[in-house]
Amino acid sequence: SFNEFDTLTFITDYVNPFYKCLVQTRINSGIDIPSGTSAINYNATSPFDEDALSINFYSPPEEYWVTPERILLGKKLFSDPILSGNKTRSCASCHQPEKAFTDGLPKPFALDNKTVLTRNTPTLYNAGFQTSQFFDSRADILENQLGEVVHNIQEMSGSLHKSVADLKKDVLYKQLFDRAYPKEPINNFIIANAISSYIRSLHSLNARFDQYIRGDKKQLNAAEKKGFNLFMGKAKCATCHFIPLFNGAVPPLYTTTESEVLGVPKTKNKNPAQLDDDLGKYLFIKSDVYKHSFKTPTLRNIELTAPYMHNGVFDTLEEVMEFYNNGGGKGLHIAPENQTLPFDQLDLSKKEIREIIAFMKTLTDTTTTKNLY
């Protein structure tokens, strides 16, 4: 059965060689696919290569694609409170590089440092490789997501329009903008594009798992290998967390990003458990199927991004696995009618859960940050 299928060996010994052969055949046939026209980089020799997906596909038109100058400018803006209304908060206040671009809190504080916001801070690693931003998928590209955060009264209470004037007065910023955008004066969009370019540079696709699947068989131990096969099979994790990004970007084209209804509890209290009252995607798309629906986040760097779920309700991966093993909200008797997570229990043993967690920890890769900071 598929539960016993050795998916890892199948990928390394059969899928990768076949994929490489297909790429070479296309090249030999003289078939050219221009960059940016597809999410898939058809020059990559494996679906697990670092450049297997094209970041430009998820970007604005070509004149706003990522360049080294824009990354440098975006990195400076990312850590500068100049965009916030009271000049005390930057993007890095919540998306902290040393915490895999999260903040380690169940939910972040608002600008007043007293009010608690409604959702957990997600990692920014690989955030550029998706067509939906925010847990409720209300923004499409990073530029639009960034504008919402800057203008949100509780988050930054700023104004990109007002920031233009501030940035024009700064000699260093003027130089950086001239190098990054030599044909345009400083404006709202290129501020957002610069920060988005920096975020698009935050690739995390060279973890131990990736190195193993590209041929370095020393990178995974027996428990981690078993964990991957369980992840793909019996545990059904990969039916929502699609490879190679391990998020909701749907193969084979990776042009849509899925959301799921899990029945996440409001707190860890089980006597009785309460369904979290955040309606998720339904707040923006008034269809009952989207009630309590949230975007499937990436599992890459998962060991660094606790606490978990859209509301930060679970502190450990063990708690997360227990929730899924029992059928999500159904197992807590709080499942909404539209729960998309299968109601049946997974019947994973404690050993199997440990193996899955061991595998997930092989998805840790912060080399991009080390190179930037």
Which positions does each model-derived feature cover?
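Aromatic- and histidine-enriched alpha-helix N-cap/loop-to-helix transition segments
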Residues: 13, 119, 186, 190, ...
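Short glycine/threonine-rich turn/loop motifs
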Residues: 40-148, 212-315, 319-322, 328-334, ...
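C-terminal accessory segments of extracellular proteins
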Residues: 326-373
